[in-house]
């Protein structure tokens, strides 16, 4: 794509001339249903994700020092909460027809923060799945002390890698003035370098989707084989939810990279971009919904009780030797994330 091309990241809502615009009567109609459709979705994600992740973060924060597994859920809930809190900021350019109101600094910072939280959530989920797998398989070297240290290191590594994945967003973003219709856009400009764009897309696809997907699917598959006699609906829901939310987003990135400039394929992909981004954002409210649904027996008592159930299920063997004997303390009984 050319200098004014946009990538599949947040805040990019530029139009191509893939549909007629009638300005003969002095009123240009530039409202595209596909571009305003994400607004109700963003509202639903915000209303569900903010209180849900806030509750999980609050409960996890209270017990994180005593329970190693709570650290995972604390970091995961914080990442998802920050992502959900950013939705009103993300919705404003959509509601204003693609006009960016936050200036040049906001153009570089705000989309990068959103990307940071989303990638951190994905990488933390993959690392948590690996931790659960280690606990279930029970390697001798994975003791409680080593696990506590390993969890802290893994959380830091997940945030660091997520930060590195967002660096191109901050480097290559700029404001672009359009004149028809008149609006200021926040776009990603690779300066016409297709090699740079291809490299960024490939790295994000591998480290932001394919790698975590393989890790999550492999670890939960191993857990299924390890305890084949029990039903594992939540583990399946985690893998399916991850794939459904993130696969379209990264496939769209590949399409935007390989599509020819001014092609019909590129135009359709850009029109669908806000809705597909919304689907990826929906993953930020998925985990609390899964906790509450599969912990609905405890939810009848109270909302914090359901969160405590999710935390207890993430502890595994470091809680007690009796954990393997009790279904209420069995890590693999529901493979909570």
From Swiss-Prot:
Which residues, renumbered to this chain, are glycosylated? 3
Annotated tissue distribution: Frontal cortex, hippocampus, hypothalamus, pons and liver.
The record's listing under SUPFAM superfamilies reads: Family A G protein-coupled receptor-like
- GO molecular function list: complement component C5a receptor activity; G protein-coupled receptor activity
Q: Which InterPro entries is this protein grouped with?
A: Anphylx_rcpt_C3a/C5a1-2, Formyl_rcpt-rel, GPCR_Rhodpsn, GPCR_Rhodpsn_7TM
Cysteine-cysteine disulfides? 107-186
- Highest taxon above the source species: Eukaryota
Q: Does the keyword Acyltransferase apply?
A: no
State the Gene3D superfamilies in the record: Rhodopsin 7-helix transmembrane proteins (1.20.1070.10)
One of its Pfam families is: 7tm_1
Please tell me where this protein is predominantly located. membrane
Segments on the Cytoplasmic face: 62-72, 138-149, 226-237, 295-337
Tell me the impact of changing residue 323 to I.
Found in a family with familial combined hyperlipemia; uncertain significance; correlated with increased plasma triglyceride, plasma cholesterol, low-density lipoprotein cholesterol, apolipoprotein B and ASP
Q: Which residues lie on this side of the membrane: Extracellular?
A: 1-38, 96-114, 173-202, 261-274
Subcellular locations according to the entry:
Cell membrane
This protein's membrane topology, according to the annotation, is:
Multi-pass membrane protein
The alphabetized list of GO BP terms reads: chemotaxis; complement receptor mediated signaling pathway; inflammatory response; negative regulation of interleukin-6 production; negative regulation of neutrophil chemotaxis; negative regulation of tumor necrosis factor production; phospholipase C-activating G protein-coupled receptor signaling pathway; positive regulation of cytosolic calcium ion concentration
Which cellular components does GO assign to this protein? apical part of cell; basal plasma membrane; plasma membrane
Family designation: Belongs to the G-protein coupled receptor 1 family.
Task: Please give the function described in this protein's UniProt entry.
Answer: Receptor for the chemotactic and inflammatory C3a, C4a and C5a anaphylatoxin peptides and also for their dearginated forms ASP/C3adesArg, C4adesArg and C5adesArg respectively. Couples weakly to G(i)-mediated signaling pathways.
| Subunit annotation | Interacts with C3 (the anaphylatoxin peptide C3a and the adipogenic hormone ASP); the interaction occurs with higher affinity for ASP, enhancing the phosphorylation and activation of GPR77, recruitment of ARRB2 to the cell surface and endocytosis of GRP77.
Protein name, as recorded: C5a anaphylatoxin chemotactic receptor 2
């Amino acid at each position: 794509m050319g200098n004014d091309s946009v990538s599949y990241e947040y805040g990019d809502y530029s139009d191509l001339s893939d549909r007629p615009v009638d300005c003969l009567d002095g009123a240009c109609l530039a409202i595209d249903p596909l571009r305003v459709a994400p607004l109700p979705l963003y509202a639903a994600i915000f209303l569900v994700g903010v209180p849900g992740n806030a509750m999980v973060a609050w409960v996890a924060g209270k017990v994180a020092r005593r329970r190693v597994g709570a650290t995972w859920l604390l970091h995961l809930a914080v990442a998802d909460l920050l992502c959900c809190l950013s939705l009103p900021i993300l919705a404003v350019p959509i509601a204003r027809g693609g006009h960016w109101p936050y200036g040049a600094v906001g153009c570089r910072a705000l989309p990068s923060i959103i990307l940071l939280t989303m990638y951190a959530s994905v990488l933390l989920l993959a690392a948590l799945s690996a931790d659960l797998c280690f606990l279930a398989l029970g390697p001798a070297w994975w003791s409680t002390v080593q696990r506590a240290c390993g969890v802290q290191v893994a959380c830091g590594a997940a945030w660091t890698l997520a930060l590195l994945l967002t660096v191109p967003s901050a480097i290559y973003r700029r404001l672009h003035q359009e004149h028809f219709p008149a609006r200021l856009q926040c776009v990603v400009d690779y300066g016409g370098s297709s090699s740079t764009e291809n490299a960024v897309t490939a790295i994000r696809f591998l480290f932001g989707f394919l790698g975590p997907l393989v890790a999550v699917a492999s670890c939960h598959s191993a857990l299924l084989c390890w305890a084949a006699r029990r039903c594992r609906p939540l583990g399946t829901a985690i893998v399916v939810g991850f794939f459904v939310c993130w696969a379209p987003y990264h496939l769209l990135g590949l399409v935007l990279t390989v599509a020819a400039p001014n092609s019909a394929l590129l135009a359709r992909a850009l029109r669908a971009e806000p809705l597909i981004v919304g689907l990826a954002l929906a993953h930020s409210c998925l985990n609390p919904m899964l906790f509450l649904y599969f912990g609905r027996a405890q939810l009848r008592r109270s909302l914090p009780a359901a969160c405590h159930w999710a935390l207890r299920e993430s502890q595994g063997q470091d809680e007690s030797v009796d954990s393997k004997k009790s279904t209420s303390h069995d890590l693999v009984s529901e493979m909570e994330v």
